[in-house]
Amino acid sequence: MKRTKSIRHASFRKNWSARHLTPVALAVATVFMLAGCEKSDETVSLYQNADDCSAANPGKSAECTTAYNNALKEAERTAPKYATREDCVAEFGEGQCQQAPAQAGMAPENQAQAQQSSGSFWMPLMAGYMMGRLMGGGAGFAQQPLFSSKNPASPAYGKYTDATGKNYGAAQPGRTMTVPKTAMAPKPATTTTVTRGGFGESVAKQSTLQRSATGTSSRSMGG
């Protein structure tokens, strides 16, 4: 009889442990899953220039200026390049294009047009930039240049888009939004020129991909 009681007590302790530890294990797993989701997204703010950033972040004017200047450099490296001023203006509007030095590796689709532009290419002015929210204690931050089409017929019209054509909504500075961390990653340098209307086509393709990805994610979460 003593042996039977001992076995029953051991069984009770085993079952009790299983019932009470399982919810804890699930809770821990949930925490790790949530942490994974948090790491994949980043909260960013959209500014037109360093002054906008400084006004929104008092005492951080130096950081705002650094981020703005870095975004300008990134824009020069990654912005869509056009062989002629006319092609650039057709997408981004009069007064919104500037001449950019020819970059190593550039391969204009029309070499004659490139020569007409005196060996230089044309690129849109940076319309704004996306910046990782400033953190206390001098934490690091990232920035990404944004462009905006002035052509009503373009899919990019009135939108903030990055160099790859990804759309981040209306071209209105001062907004805060959540984006994938990949959105803040450096973009590849431009190595070819864009034909007239080509950037708008890139934006349309990216929008289709974004909608498709969102739909797939929703279906997965819904089971």
Swiss-Prot record:
Belongs to the UPF0441 family. Pfam families: DUF1190. NCBIfam families: PRK11653.1. This is UPF0441 protein YgiB. Residues 178-223 are annotated as: Disordered. Residues 178-195 have a biased composition (Low complexity). The lineage of its organism: Bacteria, Pseudomonadati, Pseudomonadota, Gammaproteobacteria, Enterobacterales. It comes from the Bacteria. Residues 204-223 have a biased composition (Polar residues). The gene is ygiB.
